[in-house]
Protein backbone atom coordinates (compact mmCIF):
# COMPACT_ATOMS: atom_id res chain seq x y z
CA UNK A 1 0.00 0.00 0.00
CA UNK A 2 1.45 3.40 -0.99
CA UNK A 3 1.59 6.34 1.43
CA UNK A 4 -1.01 8.15 -0.69
CA UNK A 5 -3.47 5.26 -0.66
CA UNK A 6 -2.96 4.78 3.08
CA UNK A 7 -3.70 8.45 3.75
CA UNK A 8 -6.76 8.34 1.50
CA UNK A 9 -8.08 5.45 3.58
CA UNK A 10 -7.55 7.38 6.79
CA UNK A 11 -9.27 10.43 5.30
CA UNK A 12 -12.48 8.56 4.69
CA UNK A 13 -12.39 5.92 1.98
CA UNK A 14 -12.71 3.06 4.45
CA UNK A 15 -15.88 1.04 5.02
CA UNK A 16 -19.16 2.71 5.96
CA UNK A 17 -19.68 1.07 9.40
CA UNK A 18 -16.60 2.86 10.75
CA UNK A 19 -17.81 6.31 9.60
CA UNK A 20 -21.17 6.31 11.37
CA UNK A 21 -21.65 7.87 14.80
CA UNK A 22 -23.14 5.45 17.33
CA UNK A 23 -25.44 6.05 20.28
CA UNK A 24 -24.06 3.05 22.21
CA UNK A 25 -20.94 0.89 22.20
CA UNK A 26 -23.14 -2.16 21.57
CA UNK A 27 -23.91 -0.96 18.05
CA UNK A 28 -20.24 -1.46 17.19
CA UNK A 29 -20.50 -5.24 17.60
CA UNK A 30 -19.92 -7.07 14.31
CA UNK A 31 -18.97 -5.86 10.83
CA UNK A 32 -15.34 -6.74 11.51
CA UNK A 33 -12.62 -6.50 8.84
CA UNK A 34 -11.58 -9.40 6.62
CA UNK A 35 -7.86 -9.38 5.81
CA UNK A 36 -5.69 -11.63 3.67
CA UNK A 37 -2.84 -13.49 5.35
CA UNK A 38 0.18 -13.69 3.05
CA UNK A 39 3.63 -12.78 4.29
CA UNK A 40 3.98 -15.43 7.01
CA UNK A 41 2.77 -18.32 4.86
CA UNK A 42 5.17 -21.10 3.82
CA UNK A 43 6.57 -20.84 0.29
CA UNK A 44 4.79 -23.99 -0.89
CA UNK A 45 1.39 -22.28 -0.75
CA UNK A 46 0.63 -20.77 -4.19
CA UNK A 47 -0.99 -17.41 -4.85
CA UNK A 48 -4.25 -18.99 -6.01
CA UNK A 49 -4.83 -20.69 -2.65
CA UNK A 50 -5.91 -17.72 -0.56
CA UNK A 51 -6.20 -17.49 3.23
CA UNK A 52 -8.37 -14.74 4.70
CA UNK A 53 -9.17 -13.97 8.35
CA UNK A 54 -11.93 -12.13 10.17
CA UNK A 55 -10.26 -9.89 12.75
CA UNK A 56 -12.69 -10.20 15.64
CA UNK A 57 -10.46 -8.13 17.92
CA UNK A 58 -12.12 -5.13 16.22
CA UNK A 59 -15.27 -5.77 18.25
CA UNK A 60 -15.61 -3.31 21.16
CA UNK A 61 -15.00 -6.02 23.77
CA UNK A 62 -12.01 -7.26 21.80
CA UNK A 63 -13.21 -10.67 20.64
CA UNK A 64 -15.64 -12.72 18.58
CA UNK A 65 -17.59 -13.40 21.78
CA UNK A 66 -19.17 -9.95 21.68
CA UNK A 67 -21.56 -11.34 19.06
CA UNK A 68 -23.07 -14.21 21.09
CA UNK A 69 -22.90 -12.23 24.34
CA UNK A 70 -25.07 -9.48 22.89
CA UNK A 71 -27.34 -12.02 21.22
CA UNK A 72 -27.87 -14.02 24.43
CA UNK A 73 -28.51 -10.86 26.45
CA UNK A 74 -31.07 -9.54 23.96
CA UNK A 75 -32.76 -12.95 23.76
CA UNK A 76 -33.05 -13.13 27.56
CA UNK A 77 -34.44 -9.58 27.69
CA UNK A 78 -36.95 -10.35 24.95
CA UNK A 79 -38.16 -13.42 26.86
CA UNK A 80 -38.51 -11.43 30.07
CA UNK A 81 -35.86 -13.38 31.95
CA UNK A 82 -33.73 -10.38 32.90
CA UNK A 83 -35.64 -8.28 35.42
CA UNK A 84 -34.78 -5.86 38.20
CA UNK A 85 -32.85 -7.66 40.93
CA UNK A 86 -31.72 -10.47 38.66
CA UNK A 87 -28.04 -11.26 38.05
CA UNK A 88 -26.72 -12.68 34.78
CA UNK A 89 -24.26 -15.55 35.28
CA UNK A 90 -22.23 -17.87 33.07
CA UNK A 91 -19.09 -19.98 32.86
CA UNK A 92 -16.31 -18.84 30.55
CA UNK A 93 -12.71 -19.34 29.52
CA UNK A 94 -12.38 -15.56 29.35
CA UNK A 95 -13.59 -13.89 26.17
CA UNK A 96 -17.30 -14.58 26.67
CA UNK A 97 -16.90 -13.35 30.22
CA UNK A 98 -15.37 -10.10 29.03
CA UNK A 99 -18.12 -9.70 26.45
CA UNK A 100 -20.91 -10.41 28.95
CA UNK A 101 -19.35 -8.00 31.45
CA UNK A 102 -19.20 -5.31 28.74
CA UNK A 103 -22.81 -5.84 27.64
CA UNK A 104 -23.96 -5.93 31.25
CA UNK A 105 -22.20 -2.64 31.98
CA UNK A 106 -23.76 -1.03 28.90
CA UNK A 107 -27.26 -2.23 29.82
CA UNK A 108 -26.96 -1.72 33.58
CA UNK A 109 -27.36 -5.41 34.39
CA UNK A 110 -25.13 -7.03 37.08
CA UNK A 111 -23.00 -9.93 35.86
CA UNK A 112 -21.20 -12.76 37.68
CA UNK A 113 -18.77 -15.11 35.96
CA UNK A 114 -16.83 -18.29 36.73
CA UNK A 115 -13.59 -19.13 34.95
CA UNK A 116 -10.51 -21.33 35.48
CA UNK A 117 -7.94 -19.69 37.73
CA UNK A 118 -5.13 -20.21 35.22
CA UNK A 119 -6.49 -17.97 32.47
CA UNK A 120 -4.42 -14.89 31.69
CA UNK A 121 -4.32 -12.10 34.26
CA UNK A 122 -5.39 -9.63 31.61
CA UNK A 123 -8.72 -11.42 31.17
CA UNK A 124 -9.43 -11.33 34.89
CA UNK A 125 -8.62 -7.63 35.14
CA UNK A 126 -10.73 -6.65 32.14
CA UNK A 127 -13.75 -8.49 33.53
CA UNK A 128 -13.35 -6.71 36.86
CA UNK A 129 -12.87 -3.37 35.08
CA UNK A 130 -16.35 -3.76 33.58
CA UNK A 131 -17.72 -4.23 37.10
CA UNK A 132 -18.52 -7.94 36.97
CA UNK A 133 -18.00 -10.32 39.91
CA UNK A 134 -15.52 -13.09 39.21
CA UNK A 135 -15.26 -16.62 40.64
CA UNK A 136 -12.06 -18.57 39.94
CA UNK A 137 -12.32 -22.36 39.66
CA UNK A 138 -9.85 -25.26 39.69
CA UNK A 139 -7.50 -24.82 36.70
CA UNK A 140 -7.09 -28.58 36.33
CA UNK A 141 -10.80 -28.89 35.58
CA UNK A 142 -10.71 -26.27 32.81
CA UNK A 143 -13.97 -24.70 31.68
CA UNK A 144 -15.81 -27.88 32.70
CA UNK A 145 -15.07 -26.99 36.32
CA UNK A 146 -16.42 -23.49 35.79
CA UNK A 147 -19.59 -24.90 34.21
CA UNK A 148 -20.20 -27.25 37.15
CA UNK A 149 -19.58 -24.41 39.62
CA UNK A 150 -22.15 -22.18 37.93
CA UNK A 151 -24.72 -24.98 37.75
CA UNK A 152 -24.40 -25.57 41.49
CA UNK A 153 -24.71 -21.85 42.24
CA UNK A 154 -27.80 -21.47 40.04
CA UNK A 155 -29.38 -24.55 41.62
CA UNK A 156 -28.76 -23.09 45.07
CA UNK A 157 -30.09 -19.60 44.23
CA UNK A 158 -32.55 -20.05 41.34
CA UNK A 159 -34.44 -16.80 42.06
CA UNK A 160 -31.26 -14.72 41.90
CA UNK A 161 -29.66 -15.79 38.64
CA UNK A 162 -30.32 -15.75 34.92
CA UNK A 163 -28.01 -18.47 33.57
CA UNK A 164 -27.24 -17.67 29.94
CA UNK A 165 -25.45 -21.03 29.47
CA UNK A 166 -23.44 -20.19 26.36
CA UNK A 167 -22.65 -23.85 25.71
CA UNK A 168 -26.31 -24.78 25.26
CA UNK A 169 -27.95 -21.50 24.26
CA UNK A 170 -29.20 -21.35 20.62
CA UNK A 171 -28.84 -17.56 20.73
CA UNK A 172 -25.08 -18.24 20.70
CA UNK A 173 -24.87 -19.84 17.25
CA UNK A 174 -27.70 -17.69 15.89
CA UNK A 175 -25.54 -14.62 16.49
CA UNK A 176 -23.15 -15.93 13.83
CA UNK A 177 -25.93 -17.16 11.55
CA UNK A 178 -27.31 -13.63 11.40
CA UNK A 179 -23.99 -11.76 11.29
CA UNK A 180 -20.64 -13.50 10.78
CA UNK A 181 -21.77 -15.82 7.99
CA UNK A 182 -23.45 -13.01 6.07
CA UNK A 183 -20.43 -10.74 6.48
CA UNK A 184 -18.01 -13.38 5.19
CA UNK A 185 -20.17 -14.16 2.17
CA UNK A 186 -20.44 -10.47 1.28
CA UNK A 187 -16.79 -9.67 1.96
CA UNK A 188 -15.58 -12.50 -0.28
CA UNK A 189 -18.28 -11.75 -2.86
CA UNK A 190 -19.32 -15.38 -2.61
CA UNK A 191 -15.86 -16.70 -3.53
CA UNK A 192 -15.30 -18.59 -0.24
CA UNK A 193 -14.62 -22.31 -0.71
CA UNK A 194 -13.65 -23.35 2.83
CA UNK A 195 -14.55 -22.05 6.29
CA UNK A 196 -12.19 -22.93 9.15
CA UNK A 197 -12.92 -22.15 12.81
CA UNK A 198 -11.81 -23.21 16.26
CA UNK A 199 -14.27 -25.05 18.49
CA UNK A 200 -14.99 -23.78 21.99
CA UNK A 201 -18.74 -23.60 22.51
CA UNK A 202 -19.22 -24.45 18.84
CA UNK A 203 -21.23 -21.28 18.28
CA UNK A 204 -18.97 -19.69 15.68
CA UNK A 205 -18.58 -22.73 13.47
CA UNK A 206 -22.21 -23.87 13.74
CA UNK A 207 -23.82 -20.49 13.10
CA UNK A 208 -21.41 -19.27 10.44
CA UNK A 209 -21.22 -22.68 8.79
CA UNK A 210 -24.98 -23.07 8.60
CA UNK A 211 -25.35 -19.67 6.96
CA UNK A 212 -22.59 -20.34 4.44
CA UNK A 213 -24.02 -23.76 3.55
CA UNK A 214 -27.31 -22.04 2.68
CA UNK A 215 -25.48 -19.75 0.28
CA UNK A 216 -23.43 -22.59 -1.21
CA UNK A 217 -23.74 -26.21 0.02
CA UNK A 218 -20.32 -26.99 -1.51
CA UNK A 219 -18.49 -24.77 0.97
CA UNK A 220 -16.43 -27.00 3.27
CA UNK A 221 -16.80 -26.34 7.01
CA UNK A 222 -13.76 -27.42 8.98
CA UNK A 223 -13.36 -27.43 12.76
CA UNK A 224 -10.15 -26.89 14.73
CA UNK A 225 -9.52 -28.63 18.05
CA UNK A 226 -6.51 -29.04 20.35
CA UNK A 227 -4.69 -32.31 19.69
CA UNK A 228 -4.78 -33.39 23.35
CA UNK A 229 -7.04 -33.02 26.42
CA UNK A 230 -4.37 -31.04 28.30
CA UNK A 231 -3.37 -28.12 26.12
CA UNK A 232 -2.53 -24.42 26.22
CA UNK A 233 -4.86 -23.07 23.56
CA UNK A 234 -7.20 -20.86 25.57
CA UNK A 235 -10.71 -20.72 24.18
CA UNK A 236 -10.64 -24.07 22.37
CA UNK A 237 -12.00 -27.41 23.62
CA UNK A 238 -10.81 -30.95 23.11
CA UNK A 239 -14.37 -32.15 22.61
CA UNK A 240 -13.84 -35.87 23.25
CA UNK A 241 -12.51 -35.26 26.76
CA UNK A 242 -14.81 -32.35 27.70
CA UNK A 243 -18.44 -31.68 28.48
CA UNK A 244 -19.83 -31.52 24.96
CA UNK A 245 -21.61 -28.22 24.21
CA UNK A 246 -25.27 -28.81 23.44
CA UNK A 247 -25.21 -26.41 20.48
CA UNK A 248 -22.35 -28.26 18.78
CA UNK A 249 -23.10 -30.97 16.22
CA UNK A 250 -19.92 -32.67 15.06
CA UNK A 251 -21.76 -34.42 12.21
CA UNK A 252 -22.36 -31.02 10.60
CA UNK A 253 -18.63 -30.56 9.98
CA UNK A 254 -16.94 -31.78 6.83
CA UNK A 255 -13.82 -32.55 8.86
CA UNK A 256 -11.77 -31.58 11.91
CA UNK A 257 -8.10 -30.62 12.06
CA UNK A 258 -6.25 -31.18 15.35
CA UNK A 259 -3.55 -28.70 16.36
CA UNK A 260 -0.77 -28.96 18.94
CA UNK A 261 -0.20 -26.11 21.39
CA UNK A 262 3.32 -25.43 20.14
CA UNK A 263 2.10 -24.93 16.57
CA UNK A 264 -0.67 -22.60 17.70
CA UNK A 265 1.84 -20.47 19.61
CA UNK A 266 4.35 -20.44 16.77
CA UNK A 267 1.88 -19.24 14.15
CA UNK A 268 0.39 -16.59 16.44
CA UNK A 269 3.89 -15.16 16.83
CA UNK A 270 4.58 -15.40 13.09
CA UNK A 271 1.40 -13.48 12.34
CA UNK A 272 2.59 -10.60 14.52
CA UNK A 273 6.15 -10.56 13.17
CA UNK A 274 5.43 -10.93 9.46
CA UNK A 275 1.85 -9.86 8.77
CA UNK A 276 1.59 -7.36 11.64
CA UNK A 277 -1.55 -9.14 12.86
CA UNK A 278 -1.43 -9.32 16.67
CA UNK A 279 -3.60 -12.21 17.86
CA UNK A 280 -3.99 -14.88 20.54
CA UNK A 281 -3.11 -18.56 20.40
CA UNK A 282 -6.51 -19.73 19.15
CA UNK A 283 -5.88 -17.62 16.05
CA UNK A 284 -2.52 -19.30 15.64
CA UNK A 285 -4.28 -22.66 15.81
CA UNK A 286 -6.79 -21.56 13.17
CA UNK A 287 -4.02 -20.37 10.86
CA UNK A 288 -2.04 -23.60 11.19
CA UNK A 289 -5.17 -25.55 10.26
CA UNK A 290 -5.63 -23.27 7.24
CA UNK A 291 -2.02 -23.83 6.18
CA UNK A 292 -2.43 -27.60 6.30
CA UNK A 293 -5.62 -27.32 4.25
CA UNK A 294 -3.96 -24.96 1.76
CA UNK A 295 -1.10 -27.40 1.25
CA UNK A 296 -3.57 -30.19 0.52
CA UNK A 297 -5.31 -28.05 -2.11
CA UNK A 298 -1.99 -27.04 -3.66
CA UNK A 299 -0.85 -30.67 -3.96
CA UNK A 300 -4.05 -31.48 -5.83
CA UNK A 301 -3.61 -28.46 -8.09
CA UNK A 302 -6.82 -26.88 -6.80
CA UNK A 303 -7.55 -23.23 -6.12
CA UNK A 304 -9.19 -22.13 -2.89
CA UNK A 305 -10.50 -19.21 -0.88
CA UNK A 306 -10.08 -20.26 2.74
CA UNK A 307 -11.66 -18.03 5.37
CA UNK A 308 -11.06 -18.34 9.09
CA UNK A 309 -11.84 -16.40 12.24
CA UNK A 310 -9.14 -14.88 14.43
CA UNK A 311 -11.15 -14.77 17.69
CA UNK A 312 -9.20 -12.09 19.54
CA UNK A 313 -6.09 -9.94 19.75
CA UNK A 314 -2.84 -10.69 21.55
CA UNK A 315 -3.12 -8.04 24.25
CA UNK A 316 -4.69 -10.42 26.76
CA UNK A 317 -1.78 -12.86 26.51
CA UNK A 318 1.24 -10.62 27.09
CA UNK A 319 1.89 -12.16 30.52
CA UNK A 320 1.48 -15.75 29.27
CA UNK A 321 3.86 -18.23 27.64
CA UNK A 322 2.59 -17.13 24.24
CA UNK A 323 4.62 -13.93 24.37
CA UNK A 324 7.36 -14.85 26.81
CA UNK A 325 10.82 -13.80 25.68
CA UNK A 326 11.61 -15.72 22.51
CA UNK A 327 13.67 -14.93 19.45
Curated annotation (Swiss-Prot):
MF annotations from Gene Ontology: cysteine synthase activity
Keyword Transmembrane listed: no
Cofactor(s) of this protein: pyridoxal 5'-phosphate
Entry protein name: Cysteine synthase
Reaction(s) catalysed by this chain's protein: O-acetyl-L-serine + hydrogen sulfide = L-cysteine + acetate
Top EC class, one word: transferase
Taxonomic source organism: Aquifex aeolicus (strain VF5)
Pathway: Amino-acid biosynthesis; L-cysteine biosynthesis; L-cysteine from L-serine: step 2/2
Family recorded in the similarity comment: Belongs to the cysteine synthase/cystathionine beta-synthase family.
Family matches, as Gene3D superfamilies: 3.40.50.1100
Keyword Membrane recorded: no
